[in-house]
From Swiss-Prot:
Taxonomic lineage of the native organism: Bacteria, Pseudomonadati, Pseudomonadota, Gammaproteobacteria, Pasteurellales
Cofactor(s) it depends on: Mg(2+)
Biological processes, Gene Ontology terms: canonical glycolysis; fructose 1,6-bisphosphate metabolic process; fructose 6-phosphate metabolic process
Protein name: ATP-dependent 6-phosphofructokinase
Cellular location(s): Cytoplasm
UniProt record similarity statement: Belongs to the phosphofructokinase type A (PFKA) family. ATP-dependent PFK group I subfamily. Prokaryotic clade 'B1' sub-subfamily.
Species of provenance: Pasteurella multocida (strain Pm70)
GO molecular function: 6-phosphofructokinase activity; AMP binding; ATP binding; fructose-6-phosphate binding; identical protein binding; metal ion binding; monosaccharide binding
């Protein structure tokens, strides 16, 4: 019978994480459980940064971006001895189960605690990249999408004024959901996705044809890590004789007030994670599919499940050019 649970956020922060923490804390307290917050992720767990939460610990945070518990990269968690110490610290506080909010790396940590130490963990997908298997949306994705679209709108204003080609690099690592969605919503003339081999020559030829037809400015949305966008801008400008500039949105996409969707999603997932633990279901991760909350075996989600590439969305963007 679970009496005490803990919650931590790990990896990159995402708008809506605070709503998820709040959902965990308040629903667990309402069920008569004790709740502990672990500050600075797995790093904080290893250094025993554990504090008991009350309902007032999570007051006035639902509208705040980031995570008030903090987060930190902690590659040392790959060491079995480090994980053993973390499990020991959890048990020293009498904690029976753990909720982990984060991306794939955070899930891996929860998976190892479950596998190696029999510690019940539930993962909640929190990352702007929307690259976690087993869910249609991750917490933070919709807010980051809105941020990217607003940036594209602003770039279009200045690009049209100066007849300029603008390249905007959007986060996502190896998942192009953000770039594709922002590109469609922002009316980008070209979208470069990481799931499709980048053909630089083809892109430049497309731009040249557009200029011949009278196009005076353009926006190119590209997922990060595909190429050096500043170097690409220089090459395009040299080839097509049209001023070209690159903008890297970077970490601005992680910040800001979470949108209503992410606040609601985080709240729902936080409560659902507690429900699973109270039912004795540790070793799972939470998701939302077709607007319904679901859960999957966390080991299966990491090892066997893959996110589907939005190829039809990319095809749609080309028809809208």
């Amino acid at each position: 019978m679970i009496k005490k649970i803990a919650v931590l956020t790990s990896g990159g922060d995402a708008p809506g994480m605070n709503a998820a923490i709040r959902g965990v804390v308040r629903s667990a307290l309402a069920a008569g459980l004790e709740v502990y917050g672990i500050y600075e992720g797995y790093y904080g767990l290893y250094h025993n940064k554990v504090k008991q939460m009350t309902r007032y610990s999570v007051s006035d945070i639902i509208n705040r971006g980031g995570t008030f518990l903090g987060s930190a990269r902690f590659p040392e968690f790959k060491d079995p001895a480090v994980r053993a110490k973390c499990a020991e610290i959890l048990r020293s506080h009498g904690i029976d189960a753990l909720v982990v909010i984060g991306g794939d790396g955070s899930y891996m940590g929860a998976k190892l605690l479950t596998e190696e130490h029999g510690f019940p963990c539930v993962g909640i997908p929190g990352t702007i990249d929307n690259d976690v298997a087993g869910t249609d949306y991750t917490i933070g994705y919709q807010t980051a999408l809105q941020t990217a679209v607003e940036a594209i709108d602003r770039l279009r204003d200045t690009s049209s004024s100066h007849q300029r080609i603008s390249i905007v690099e959007i986060m996502g690592r190896h998942c192009s959901d953000l770039a594709i969605s922002a590109g469609i919503a922002g009316g980008c003339e070209y979208i470069v996705a990481s799931e499709v081999e980048f053909n630089r020559e083809e892109l430049i030829q497309q731009i040249e044809r557009s200029i011949i037809k009278g196009k005076r400015h353009a926006i190119i949305a590209i997922t990060e890590l595909i190429c050096d966008v500043n170097e690409l801008a220089r090459e395009i400008e040299s080839r097509v004789k049209h001023e070209t500039r690159a903008t890297i949105l970077g970490h601005i996409q992680r910040g800001g007030t979470p949108c209503a969707f992410d606040r609601i999603l985080g709240s729902r997932m936080g409560v659902y994670a507690v429900d699973l633990l109270m039912q004795g279901k540790g070793g799972y991760c939470v998701g939302i599919q077709n607007e319904q909350l679901v859960h999957h075996d966390i080991i299966d989600a990491i090892n066997n499940m893959r996110r589907e590439f939005k190829a039809d969305w990319l095809a749609l963007s080309k028809r809208l050019d």
